[in-house]
Amino acid sequence: MSSHKGKGVTRRDFLKLSGVTALGTTLAISGLSYQDLVTKAKDPDQPINIIWTGNGWCGGNTIAFLDAMNPSLEDVFTGVYFDGKSIQLRQPSISDLGLINLVYHPILMPQDSMAYATMEQALNGELDPYVLVVEGTMFDEFGLYYKKPSGSFWCSAGRKPDGSVLLCDEFVFNLMKNAYGVAATGACATYGGIPSTTNGLGKRSPTYAMGMLDDPYRGINGFPYYAYQVYQKDLAPDIIDENIYSVTGSSINTAYPGPSYHWKTKSGLPIISIAADPPAGDWIMRTLVSLVLYARGLGPNPADDLDVFNRPKFFYGNETHQNCPRAGFFAEGKFAYEFGDPQCTYSLGCKGTEANSPAPRLGWIAGVGGCTRGGVCIACTAPGFPDLYEPFYAPPNAPTVPSTTLFAAAAAAGIIVGVGSYALSRRRRAPKG
């Protein structure tokens, strides 16, 4: 690798961009200089491996990941950067933190048929430490809720040496066993998303698609608890064992928001949710970087900064509405009549007051774009999506406005007047006949 330096992400920029702010504390506690810490972190014999699985997926999260800019995929893994004129090479900033290998990805790896070999290596400890990234929903392969015809399956990760099917459920479960950290990325992998939707009458798809985490609003259990139930009913004893919940020596905790939130990796980390449909690439990249930094002893425990739905607070700590450039219109009770109007789109169905994300503030790619720049928030970062937030383009019944101050009371009055005038004006605009 060339040592040519350019205008890419520096070592200190990389740490800052990852959302980790504890480097100074780490240095103070360890008594090491920055360069000493960098040297200590390097361990070519023990890289941080990334295993990325694709289950019931569309690939949208992978595309978003490839679009990450701060830092970019190329900068992190290869040291390639674009200086505005040509492609350049430099020493990758991630090398300061120890090597990272993307061991497995169904789309990005050089050849297929590697799933089983990767699983075997992971089970044997040959890939330790590794971070497991789950994209796409999991399915009821073992007939806990729905009995499939014999020999059929919903999702395959590949073939075993004997020619039999390697089920996605089996693949992910076995990778969970030795993972240092697990991150679920996208609405489907986190809380089930669109594949787990109902028909409006509470009836689910025969796949009984589920996310890695429970959706308490729709009553859907996450994959860890599903696997535990499968084991208890002896539906797949050769694939799923009791260690699904005894890995940390703790009993099953079914407290809100659900048992799968309390499952822990062997390092004691819960499943981290990178929720959205899909999340922006920078959200995925920076969350994975925080896991890598923690694994290297260079950053704080990511579990200390998660909200109740296991989402990183540095991305999901505020409502989408709070970050929205149209929020001022909301407070004034000024609402858009149609798409293209500059006012608040609450009246057109925006669910920004019911969801958490930084999309309006950070944009989508390199600070550009974002849902509310041209459309409405459909609450894809929240459990309950999509069922609880449909129809997407119908205005909610009533906004929720704080009433503890005079300003809030005045704002509430303005919103009520604004929504009312919007409804009357829309009625006047409606074509007759």
Which role fits each region the language model picked out?
Residues M1-T10, L37:
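N-terminal secretory signal peptides
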Residues A413-R427:
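Alpha-helical transmembrane segments
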Residues P431-G433:
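Cytoplasmic C-terminal tails of single-pass
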Residues D36-V38, K42-V172:
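Extended, subdomain-level signal for the structured scaffold at the beginning of enzyme domains
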Residues W57-G59, Y191, T345-L348, G370-G384:
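Local cysteine-cluster metal-coordination motifs and their immediate loop/turn environment
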Residues A398-A410:
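Juxtamembrane/start-of-transmembrane alpha-helix segments at the extracytoplasmic/lumenal side
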Residues G281-M285, V289, L293-L362:
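A conserved mid-domain beta-alpha-beta active-site/ligand-binding segment of alpha/beta enzyme cores
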